[in-house]
A protein has these predicted regions:
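N-terminal Sec-pathway targeting helices
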Residues: 2-19
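Membrane/wall-proximal cationic-aromatic binding patches
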Residues: 22, 27-96, 116-117, 231
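Membrane-embedded segments
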Residues: 70, 74-165
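Secreted/periplasmic serine-hydrolase-like ester/acetyl group-modifying domain
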Residues: 147-244, 339-435
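Basic, ligand-binding patches in group-transfer machinery
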Residues: 223-361
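Active-site His/acidic residue clusters
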Residues: 403-409, 445-460
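A structural motif corresponding to the C-terminal end of an alpha-helix
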Residues: 425-440, 469-476
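C-terminal regions of proteins
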Residues: 454-456, 460-521
Length: 523
């Protein structure tokens, strides 16, 4: 063997070792570092990381009867798995105490996505899959009505957009590429193939999210955050941490002190704090009072009263009074149609010492939702229109929700026809049926001010017949589109308020119990 051959062999071995080392890093160490790391992300943050983390960790024990609640944000904003679990366990259904419901949902989960998740769902061996479906999940964006032609669905535009959809690139890139490789250009093909083969490339857009959150919680001040996760004031709190002008809160103390930070929007804001005694009455004097001359974040350190045993107290209850108030329009005019009234903003984990993990699928109750429920009909419609459809930067722009609303009107005057999303749903139904997997499809509650555009038309009636035609011993269908007639329980066309979701969760439980009872009798 000459020296040139030895060099070639050595090069091959080194290349193989480097390749194996990279594969070990990418396929073994990287997933451990990413998904075994504490997930401290809260509700509605980093949806793709949270879904992948949830997907990996859903497990049902042999003596459990699992329920997977699948769907898009329609499911996330209309179902509470814990409530459904509790209601089933306290029902009189056989083995009710063995049931446990979990989300298998992420934003924009379409029937196409459900089809690609079907093998993973079957591998988890749930007793039942509940698919919460709204017609908007069928990608109504691509409905079109051209002059002198019938209503149709633009499959080419859908496929073009699907090639760059997050879930198609992050969650099932290989499977999607295998089915649609003929529709990719050479550059698109290799870009998708790279995501299919290399996890570091696939997950790079959200790889830092859990680590950044961890650093913010453990080494910084928790000023920068999406949603509030701290102690809950008795009067409630807005999701982004803004308080009412007057609120009462029980705080976990640090060495007997209230040691936190607060944010004031403008100079001249006064914050007065009263501490409650052990008997539950506020002290006769103001424990803290200060007028802030500068806007921004400020430290808040307050000595508390010792209890009767003179021990260092662990908790204390305070009443905050803030004046003058702040309008939500001063902070961000895009959040609400009709301005809300704020007091101060709290740090993310205000008055709570524990940094919680595993809360990314636990919805947070905010005053954002409650304010809508107490509006007059006139104010609700005014807030709704401005919050959802008004674009001050470009009044002529047609946002997605407005486009879907217009397409619902088009469908309202159209005969029934199907497109690819229904075909993928049929494939999933057939696969579940072949594997004996029980499935419930729920046509989700819809805001009556939106459903009026198409629910009485031929297309919608044909759609309901399409879903109902698949009913069998292993598949149930429940039409709940009109089950919540109060428009003020809806944030938008199909997302429910916190309290509205409690009502729909109870309806979902009724549907589940009805289906399981019927299935049990047939067995």
């Amino acid at each position: 063997m000459n020296s040139e051959t030895r060099v070639k062999i050595k090069t091959i071995w080194i290349s193989l070792l480097l390749l194996l080392g990279f594969l070990f890093l990418d396929r073994v160490l990287f997933p451990i570092a990413l998904f075994e790391f504490p997930n401290e992300l809260e509700w509605d943050t980093s949806p793709w990381y949270n879904f992948l983390h949830k997907q990996r960790n859903i497990r049902f024990e042999k003596d459990e009867k699992g329920i997977l609640i699948a769907g898009s944000s329609v499911a996330l904003y209309s179902a509470y798995p814990k409530q459904i679990t509790d209601e089933i366990r306290t029902s009189n259904i056989k083995d009710g105490e063995k049931f446990r419901a979990e989300f298998y949902s992420h934003p924009a989960l379409s029937p196409t996505d459900l089809h690609y998740y079907s093998d993973d769902i079957l591998n988890k061996k749930p007793e039942l899959v509940v698919y919460v479906l709204n017609p908007a999940d069928l990608q109504l964006d691509y409905i079109q009505k051209k002059e002198y032609s019938e209503v149709s669905f633009d499959e080419q535009a859908r496929l073009k957009d699907y090639k760059i959809r997050h879930q198609n690139r992050f969650i099932f890139p290989g499977e999607f590429l295998a089915d649609h490789w003929k529709d990719y250009t050479k550059g698109e093909f290799f870009a998708q193939l790279t995501k299919a083969l290399i996890l570091l490339n696939r997950f790079r857009s959200f790889v830092y999210d859990p680590w950044i959150e961890y650093m913010e919680h453990h080494t910084r001040t928790m000023r920068s955050y999406h949603y509030y996760t701290g102690a809950m004031p008795e009067e409630g709190i807005f999701l982004r941490g803004w308080t009412p002008p007057r609120f009462t809160i029980e705080c976990e103390l640090k060495n007997g002190k209230l040691s936190e930070e607060i944010f004031v929007q403008k100079p001249g804001i006064n914050v007065a704090i009263e501490e409650f005694t052990e008997s539950g009455l506020p002290l006769k004097f103001i424990s803290f009072g200060k007028t802030y001359t500068k806007s921004g974040w400020h430290s808040l350190v307050l000595e508390t009263q010792k209890d009767r045993s003179s021990n260092v107290p662990q908790k204390a209850k305070f009443r905050f009074t803030v004046s003058p108030t702040t309008s939500s329009d001063e902070v961000d005019a895009r959040i609400f149609g009709i301005a809300a009234t704020y007091g101060i903003r709290l740090t993310q984990n205000f008055c709570r010492n524990e940094i919680r993990t595993g809360i990314s699928y636990e919805r947070i109750h905010g005053l954002d939702d409650d304010r809508i429920e107490t509006m007059s009909d006139e104010d609700y419609l005014k807030d709704y229109e401005k919050r959802l459809y008004y674009n001050p930067e470009n009044e002529g722009a047609l946002n997605r929700l407005k486009k879907i609303q217009k397409n619902k009107e088009i469908l309202g005057n159209s005969p029934y026809f199907t497109w690819s999303e229904m075909q993928f749903l049929e494939k999933t139904i057939a696969k579940f049926k072949a594997n004996g997997q029980k499935l419930i499809i729920i046509n989700s509650p819809e805001n009556p001010i939106e459903s009026k555009y198409y629910k009485n038309g031929n297309w919608y009636q044909g759609y309901l017949k399409f879903l109902s035609s698949h009913k069998s011993d292993t598949l149930g269908f429940y039409d709940l589109k009109d089950a919540i007639p109060d428009k003020k329980l809806f944030l938008d066309p199909h997302h429910l308020t916190f309290n509205g979701a409690k009502r729909s969760s109870a309806l979902y439980t009724d549907a589940i119990l009805n289906f399981l009872n019927v299935s049990t009798r047939k067995e």
